[in-house]
Structure formats: structure tokens, C-alpha cells
């Protein structure tokens, strides 16, 4: 019998339904794997007792012929989602040992369908980062390594723990979040599938906020089908989130096998950036060839304001963060450092509670919102954002979906880029546009680099057309036949 931790989410659900194994058995297998894999540092909180309790409850429901769409499936939860009674810190010192008294809407949706929680997953502090090096718990380690090199590699960020856990078979799938590429970049780095849905599809209630107009929940999973299955359940209208869309959630799982015959796929010329590696260019061309062979029509499109996307993002996101993170003052919850007066207590709590990258972004955000610079920076960035949205509106008059690389590089070693914030920020160059425009985007593993590391392709769809992402993603997955797994060194 296959090792239970090797199963895809879809295969595990089939096995649970047909009683080939119990939820207690598969949950126990994952808990054992987690115990043996702590060197990966994927989990920051393990919940074995809660997991087994949930698994036994699932088994009882399955025995009665009852159960939800995720009944008995063990999942990992990014430490950004509030989980009632389980510590949630967004991997920041300032939240101390904060334990929520309520459940986020996304995780509640999962539990309502019978999912089992294995624990909370590592991430960049407050989701600010592209390498997961800003976590208070230290970075998770990518299960993949370069050929002939033992250097520890980043699993990407900010959802690095989610990507490392799925890639290392430490959960069937995981929740993640994406503000500028934090689902799609880690998925590309770890040979997993990650999708960011349309802004407003999934509720942000109970998600620790970074940049409210950009943050969006989504899954990281082993296959395109698994990601569709999980996203269907994560998404719902929620009156507790004012940005939540009142729209039906389609049957995305059925879209995965519909093919791309008759679809028009746009190739943006502006994504051929200076210095793009030959490997990634070749993979992009291979993706184009696969879609053509599957019956899609390829059209060149233009997204003229692409070059302004990163600068606009790194003004808008820190500005929103400086507003959102003002609530952390050591008074009502989280860590407090006493000062001689109230102001000093605020200053000391924030100075010791926020890490360097978070402090950097808060300073940028406060600066661009200050009265003398608001018009020069923030207002202009919002105008650029509107232009980027209009670029996509025009492009989608010519095509049904857009194909690009997911990342400008493969996974890099820890410390390789952390000394240069600008080089680190460039990791988001292909992903931020979808966040600024509120569009869905999926990263699908499509090949290996010469050094043996995964490479992903990204598909961007029209607003509320995740179906196109899943259709194209399914074809890319079939054509690439990506079955490579990291050699177990841990």
C-alpha cells in the first residue's frame, strides 16, 4: 500500500470514503511524519491531540454514512488564520502567545466540511517577505536541494511553511495567503500548486491583516485538482467581511479536465524582462507549445504599465500595513514591554515586537502617507494601480487567460538575497500585477532547472474566472507530467 502521506487530497478522500483506511490512521501517519521532519521547521504549532480528536469524530461520521466534502482529511493552517483556542501569532513577537477566542471564516468552512487540523504553519512575519526569513521562529527549509549542494534553500514566502509542508508530505494540503505572490512564488519554489482567487472570493475575517486591499486566502496543494477542491470550500460569501463578494462558488474541480480547445491564451511581451534566465524563458516557450498542442490559440498581448507594478505595490502595501499594524501596541493583547510612560511603552513594545523587515515596511508606509508626500507617492501609486487594472481589461478583450513564468528564479539559499531588500522584492515581479488588479492566478509546476529545482508557470484569469485558470492549469499539469519529488535528506 502507498504511504498514506504520499496521497493527493483527492485520492485520500476517496480512500476515506471507501474505508480503505480511517481518518485516525492517515492523521496518525502525518503526525509521525511531522515528528520526524521537525528539521524542516514547517510547523510552528503542532496540535496532535486536537487532530486525533477531530479524526475520530470524522471516522464516526463516515461510519454512519455522513460527512462533509473534506471529511477526515488532515490539513495544515498558515499561522495567519485565527484558530479558536490555538496560538496564532502571524510569526511575530508582538503577538506573543496570543490565542484567539474565535475562528476565521476560511478555517471554519474547512472544519464544517470535516477537515482535520494538524497544526499552524510557519510564515514570514505578518506575511511580509519573499523567503520566510522574517519569521520569529526561524525559516522553514525547502525539502528540495540543488544537485550536489547541501545548502538550505528557502521554500519562498510568505507562505513558506505551507509550501514546505505540502512538498515534504507533512499534510495533504494547506491554507496560505497571497498579498503580492505569497501563494504562487512558494508553490513555484517547491513543486506544488498554489492559487490566489479573485479578490473578495474568500473571506478575510479572522485573517491577520497585512494590506487589506491586496490580501487574499488560497490553498497550496499537490495537484491542480486538489487546489480546486480545497478552494471551492475556502471560498464563500461572508457578511463579516465588507469586501466579500456575493457570488456562487462554481464546481472548479470539473474544470480541471475540460481542456483548452478554442481558448485564446495571451502572452504579455512586457514579461520578457531584462536578465530573465534562459531556463525560465525556455520553460515559458514550452508552456506555450503545450497549450498550442492542446488546441489553444496563442496571442501576443501588451500590459504596458507592468514595469510600474512593483514600485506601486511597494507603496500601496506598506501604506496599508502601517495603518493595519498600528493596532499592535502591547495594551490589549500580545507582548508588552513596560516603559516609564504610555508613549515609551508603545515604543518599546513595537521596537522589540516587530522584526526588521516589518519595521522597514511600516516606516515606508508611514512616510508615503504623511502629509507632505501623500500626493507624490501614495496617490500616484493608486493611479498606477488603476492603469494596471485597465491594462488587464484591455488584454482580456483579446484573450481568455494569460500565461507567464511564476518567478524570475528558482529557490535560492538563505542569506543570498536578504542583504538587499530590492533584490528580494524583485521575486514578486511576475505576481504582484494580479494582486493590484484583484485577479485570480495559479502557479503550476512545469519542469526542473539544470540544478534539479522546480520551476512553475503562472496562469492569470479574468476577475471571477478561476475556471480558466484551472482549465489551463490542468492542461499544463498533464503535459508537464511533473512527478519529481525531493530526495529525502531530512
UniProtKB/Swiss-Prot annotation:
GO annotation (BP), single: translation
Reaction it catalyzes: L-glutamyl-tRNA(Gln) + L-glutamine + ATP + H2O = L-glutaminyl-tRNA(Gln) + L-glutamate + ADP + phosphate + H(+)
Annotated active site: 78, 158, 182
One GO location term (cellular component): glutamyl-tRNA(Gln) amidotransferase complex
Superkingdom of the source species: Bacteria
Lineage: Bacteria, Pseudomonadati, Pseudomonadota, Alphaproteobacteria, Hyphomonadales
Stretches for region Disordered: 131-159
Keywords per UniProt: ATP-binding, Ligase, Nucleotide-binding, Protein biosynthesis
Pfam families per record: Amidase (PF01425)
SUPFAM superfamilies: Amidase signature (AS) enzymes
Cross-referenced InterPro entries: Amidase, Amidase_CS, Amidase_dom, AS_sf, GatA
Function field: Allows the formation of correctly charged Gln-tRNA(Gln) through the transamidation of misacylated Glu-tRNA(Gln) in organisms which lack glutaminyl-tRNA synthetase. The reaction takes place in the presence of glutamine and ATP through an activated gamma-phospho-Glu-tRNA(Gln).
EC number: 6.3.5.7
Complex and partners: Heterotrimer of A, B and C subunits.
GO molecular function: ATP binding; glutaminyl-tRNA synthase (glutamine-hydrolyzing) activity
Similarity comment text for this entry: Belongs to the amidase family. GatA subfamily.
Name of the molecule in the record: Glutamyl-tRNA(Gln) amidotransferase subunit A
Underlying gene: gatA
